[in-house]
Amino acid sequence: MLPLPSLRRSLLSHAWRGAGLRWKHTSSLKVTNEPILAFSQGSPERDALQKALKDLKGQMEAIPCVVGDEEVWTSDIQYQLSPFNHAHKVAKFCYADKALLNRAIDAALAARKEWDLKPMADRAQVFLKAADMLSGPRRAEVLAKTMVGQGKTVIQAEIDAAAELIDFFRFNAKFAVELEGEQPISVPPSTNHTVYRGLEGFVAAISPFNFTAIGGNLAGAPALMGNVVLWKPSDTAMLASYAVYRILREAGLPPNIIQFVPADGPTFGDTVTSSEHLCGINFTGSVPTFKHLWRQVAQNLDRFRTFPRLAGECGGKNFHFVHSSADVDSVVSGTLRSAFEYGGQKCSACSRLYVPKSLWPQIKGRLLEEHSRIKVGDPAEDFGTFFSAVIDAKAFARIKKWLEHARSSPSLSILAGGQCNESVGYYVEPCIIESKDPQEPIMKEEIFGPVLTVYVYPDDKYRETLQLVDSTTSYGLTGAVFAQDKAIVQEATRMLRNAAGNFYINDKSTGSVVGQQPFGGARASGTNDKPGGPHYILRWTSPQVIKETHKPLGDWRYSYMQ
C-alpha cells in the first residue's frame, strides 16, 4: 500500500478552469485482506495478547460520552460485565440523556460542512492510518478488550476486531476513492462532473455487541463519505467500541465527526428520529428494534429536511441443507463451526440443519462424537476454549427458555448438550436437537445461541425439503448447500435464490470476508446493502452532477423557429 502522505497525490489530480472543477482519476488504491495471525506458542502476537489480557484482569475502565473533544458524564451510570465472569465489571459508562444527544447533534451539524468539503483522499487517510494502528501497535489491546468484554476466543476476536475491522477501513477507503473516478461522459462544448457529497444532516449509527468490526463500520463508513455521525455503541461491547473510537481520533479524525454517545435505546431512538436533521440510520440489531425505528421515521416524515436513508441488518435463521451426495466430513466440520463458534451469536450462524435419512446415522454419529470434544470456558485463561459464555443475563434467559421448550415438546429430542449454568458466567452448553416437525417454532425463530436443530427428510423428498428451507422462516440472510452432484447444486441454487443473501456451496454459512463476500440479506434479515462491498458506500453519499458549458448559449430560439 502507498505511504499515507503520498496517497492523495497518487490518487487524484485536479485543476481549476474558470468556475468548473476538472478531475482526472490517475490510479486506484491497492489493498489486500489483513492476514489472520496464528497466535502459536512463543509468537510475538501471542505474547502481546497475553500481556494485554493480564493488564485487563480485574480492571474496570471508565468510559465517558464524548461530544467533540469534551468528555461528559451523566448521572445514569451503567456497567459492562464480562460474560464468562460476571463479577468482573470491565467498564463503567454513562447514558447520554436527551439534552446531551441534542447537543451532540448540534455540534456534529456545525462540523459537517468542513468535513464534507475535504477531499475524499484526505478523509481516506484517517481510516487507512487507523487500519495500520489496528494492524500493528493497537492490535493486542482491541483483541483483549473484545475477548474480555464480549466473550470471544482468540480466533474469533482476531477475525473480528483485527482482520475484519482493518479490512472495512481499508476497502471502504479504496472503494470511496475509486468511486470518484466514476464520472459521466462529457460531450463538447460541455463537461460533466459528479461530486459525491455527504448526506445533508447527521447519521445515527446503532451497533450490536457481537462484532467490534460492525460497530467501527457502522460509524466509520458514513464518516468516510463526508457525513457526521452519532454512534450509539452496544452496552455489552462498550470496552472495545471505545477503543476503536479512540484509535480513530488518534488517527486524525477531527472532533464532532463521530460523537461517541452511549444511550438507552428508546431515548436515543426517540431523540434522533425527532430531529429534522436526521438523514440516515445505520443499524445492526433485532427485527423489532429496526421496525420500531422505521415506524418512528415514517411518523416524523414531514419533519425531516431530507428523506432519511435506513440501512439495517437484523439477523437470520440460517440453514445448512445436505443432499445425499454430500461429503460427510465437510458437513460435520462446517456445521459445528457455523452453529457453535462464538456460541451461535453470529447473525450468520447455522441453526437449522436438513439431513437426508440415508446419511443421518453417519452424520449423527460424527456430530455427537465431535460435540463431546468442544471445550466451553474462559477464553482469556485457556486458549484451547472453542467458545465461551453468551453475552449477558438476558441472552442466557432467552436461550434457556428455548431449551426448556425443547425438553417439553413432543416433536423435539435433545441429542446432546443443553445444560445451563450462570453461577460464574452465562454458560450454555452447545446443544443439538432433532425435530420431527419441520414447522416447529425452534426451526423458525432466531435463538442467537449455541442451539442447532436437525430435521431428517426422506431422500426422495429433497425438492419438497428445499421448499421448506425457503418458506419456513421470515429471514433471508445466509445458507449453505452441501452436495457433490452438480445438477443438485444448480437446482438448489435456483430454488433458494431468495432464501439467502449470502449463499454457500459446500461451505459453512458463516465467515464472510470483506471484499470477497459482501454481507447482508433481505426479507426480515434487513435491507441487504452489502457492507464489505463496493456498493455499500453509495448509501452514504448524495451525488451532485455539475454541467459546465464552455461557449455562449446563443439565441434562445431553436433553429426551426427562425
UniProtKB/Swiss-Prot annotation:
The modification N6-succinyllysine is found at K30, K92, K98, K113, K129, K174, K346, K357, K394, K508. GO terms for cellular component: cytosol; mitochondrial matrix; mitochondrion. SUPFAM superfamilies: ALDH-like. The record marks N210 as: Transition state stabilizer. It holds the Pfam family Aldedh. Substrate binds at S512. Signal peptide: none annotated. InterPro entries: Ald_DH/histidinol_DH, Ald_DH_C, Ald_DH_CS_CYS, Ald_DH_CS_GLU, Ald_DH_N, Aldehyde_DH_dom, P5CDH/ALDH4A1. The modification Phosphoserine is found at S43. The modification N6-acetyllysine is found at K51, K92, K98, K113, K129, K174, K317, K357, K364, K375, K461, K508, K530, K551. The active site is at E313, C347. It is found in: Mitochondrion matrix. NCBIfam families: D1pyr5carbox1 (TIGR01236). Homodimer. Irreversible conversion of delta-1-pyrroline-5-carboxylate (P5C), derived either from proline or ornithine, to glutamate. This is a necessary step in the pathway interconnecting the urea and tricarboxylic acid cycles. The preferred substrate is glutamic gamma-semialdehyde, other substrates include succinic, glutaric and adipic semialdehydes. Belongs to the aldehyde dehydrogenase family. This is Delta-1-pyrroline-5-carboxylate dehydrogenase, mitochondrial. It comes from Mus musculus (Mouse). The lineage of its organism: Eukaryota, Metazoa, Chordata, Craniata, Vertebrata.
